[in-house]
């Protein structure tokens, strides 16, 4: 199960009744707008469900809103659905960091100096916007910052108008302080670099995002597969289950299913 905890407590189950899973596939769309192109792709999926029995859940993530909080409404990201496929046409997407790995996140208090308890053996990142940091180790980037004056702190924000993932390097036993301007910023601890589910990432041509903010320093290879449009992404979903894209695409485009 893909794990992404936000202020929750895990419970160990002693026994459970196994049920047939409800979905074969979790389809995540992150788009700058959900217009005609998305509707056409979704219509193709509806036909596929009716005539070929594919069970799926669609998760819509608006690129101009907080992706992490929107993800919490998508049951199939967290339940026993075995596969996730992700599409984005947002070049600044953080979904590879948020969905492609396992993390534990805590909400940062707004406009309050906060000193988190951290494990120096773990890796951390911020998911937010306009977040400042003051390293308490005088040998690090925060040298010269006044722990009581946030105007002297290092600004982690990259100047984007929306929330995004930001790596926190150089964690030491001295720790750091954080200051979040907005109410929907998170401090996240990396639990696993690889998810337990099968996940594939697709991006619209000319809008290919960067990789995971933590892994990017270790690998330049892109995990994003490039497609021309969101409808072409749908054809890749057909490939995933039925193998013959062209034949199935012709069925979707030309057959009067309904």
Curated annotation (Swiss-Prot):
GO cellular component: host cell rough endoplasmic reticulum membrane; membrane; T=13 icosahedral viral capsid; viral outer capsid
Glycosylation sites: 42
Keyword Glycosyltransferase: no
Transmembrane annotation, as ranges: 1-13
Topology within the bilayer: Single-pass membrane protein
Subcellular location: Virion; Host rough endoplasmic reticulum membrane
Main location: virion
Coiled coil: none
Family: Belongs to the rotavirus VP7 family.
Function: Outer capsid protein involved in attachment and possibly entry into the host epithelial cell. It is subsequently lost, together with VP4, following virus entry into the host cell. The outer layer contains 780 copies of VP7, grouped as 260 trimers. Rotavirus attachment and entry into the host cell probably involves multiple sequential contacts between the outer capsid proteins VP4 and VP7, and the cell receptors.
Self-association state and partner proteins as the record states: Homotrimer; in the presence of calcium. Acquisition of the capsid outer layer requires a high calcium concentration inside the endoplasmic reticulum. Following cell entry, the low calcium concentration in the cytoplasm is probably responsible for the solubilization of the outer layer.
Protein known as: Outer capsid glycoprotein VP7
Organism: Rotavirus X (strain RVX/Human/China/NADRV-J19/1997/GXP[X]) (RV ADRV-N)
């Amino acid at each position: 199960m893909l794990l992404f905890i936000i202020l929750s407590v895990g419970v160990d189950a002693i026994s459970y009744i196994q049920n047939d899973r409800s979905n074969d596939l979790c389809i995540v769309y992150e788009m700058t707008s959900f217009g005609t192109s998305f509707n056409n792709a979704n219509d193709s999926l509806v036909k596929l469900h009716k005539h070929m029995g594919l069970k799926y859940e669609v998760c819509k993530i608006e690129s101009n809103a907080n992706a992490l909080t929107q993800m919490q409404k998508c049951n199939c990201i967290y339940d026993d659905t075995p596969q996730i496929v992700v599409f984005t046409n947002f070049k600044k997407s953080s979904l590879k960091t948020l969905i492609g790995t396992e993390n534990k996140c805590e909400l940062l208090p707004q406009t309050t100096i906060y000193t988190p308890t951290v494990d120096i053996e773990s890796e951390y990142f911020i998911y937010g916007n306009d977040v400042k940091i003051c390293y308490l180790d005088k040998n690090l980037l925060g040298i010269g910052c006044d722990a009581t004056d946030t105007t002297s702190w290092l600004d982690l924000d990259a100047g984007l108008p929306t929330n995004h993932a930001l790596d926190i390097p150089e964690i030491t036993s001295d720790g750091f302080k954080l200051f979040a301007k907005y109410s929907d910023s998170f401090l996240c601890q990396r639990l696993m670099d690889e998810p337990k589910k099968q996940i594939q990432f697709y991006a619209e041509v000319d809008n290919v995002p960067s990789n995971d903010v933590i892994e990017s320093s270790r690998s330049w290879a892109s995990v994003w597969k490039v497609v021309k449009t969101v409808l072409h992404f749908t054809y890749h979903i057909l490939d995933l289950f039925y193998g013959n894209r062209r034949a199935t695409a012709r069925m979707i485009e030309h057959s009067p299913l309904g």
